[in-house]
């Protein structure tokens, strides 16, 4: 049986995720676990702050998530709570609507397998308050970030 309380995140090397302005985005950190250059898949642990929301965004490629610790809350652009995924929940997703995410009463740690299957097609679009694209992030961007953080 999965013991959702035993995950020791102190072993994770958390790094900031640069926002559209180049400064670290609020309420989010990441640890890139693997970059598969052949298949164009990136495996990442994200940590979202408790009772906070990350940047508004849209997934533009296939992905899978697994909530490792805490609970992942997903919100619609109007702020309405759309979904709650506690530790132990897996979800396979496709490109979809704009949303934001965050932790519940504690920080949430979520494993994402990002699957653009292309070096240049976007994985995410970061959106402004009018849902206009501020920044697109693709496989090469995450690969470069991984190389920067690994050096």
Protein language model features and the residues they cover:
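A short, N-terminal "cap"/entry segment at the start of jelly-roll beta-barrel domains
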Residues: 1-40, 126-151
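Short acidic-glycine-tyrosine-enriched beta hairpin
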Residues: 37, 75-104
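Conserved catalytic motifs of the protein kinase core domain
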Residues: 41, 63, 107
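Glycine- and acidic-residue-biased ligand/ion/polar-headgroup-sensing regions
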Residues: 50, 59-78
């Amino acid at each position: 049986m999965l013991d959702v309380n035993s995950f020791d995140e102190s072993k994770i090397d958390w790094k900031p995720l640069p926002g559209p302005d180049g400064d670290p985005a609020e309420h989010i950190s990441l640890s890139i676990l693997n970059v598969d250059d052949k298949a164009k898949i990136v495996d990442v642990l994200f940590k979202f702050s408790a009772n906070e929301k990350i940047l508004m965004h849209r997934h533009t490629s296939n992905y899978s998530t697994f909530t490792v610790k805490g609970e992942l809350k997903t919100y619609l652009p109007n702020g309405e709570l759309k979904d709650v995924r506690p530790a132990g929940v897996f979800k396979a997703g496709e490109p979809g609507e704009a949303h934001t995410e965050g932790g519940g009463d504690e920080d949430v740690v979520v494993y994402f397998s990002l699957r653009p299957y292309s070096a240049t097609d976007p994985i995410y679009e970061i959106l402004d308050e009018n849902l206009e694209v501020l920044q697109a992030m693709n496989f090469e961007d995450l690969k470069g970030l991984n190389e920067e953080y690994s050096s």
